[in-house]
């Protein structure tokens, strides 16, 4: 089974089961600024990106979370958020090493980046 078919099947199952919050995690970001931006080392190639984005939009996926760029970044394509999280060990931008906590609740998806030096003792989930 291809990744594309897996994604279609999984999101169809989520829809059939009444899943309200749908998110997608991937190593490489789909895009950094715009869904129609050019190809590059840090993003999924456009020809593959379009196929994936069409599926995600068709199934009302709200957020895509990725890494690979070693910087924090946020962009949108319609209602879809593209959230890139910086590295824990070797950040390339101005953001310090850290991690992102993603919370999925009935009313939606929230996320927050924590620098390693600023991690709280506990995080309410």
Indicate residue ranges for each PLM-predicted region.
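Binuclear metal-dependent phosphoesterase catalytic core
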Residues: 72-125
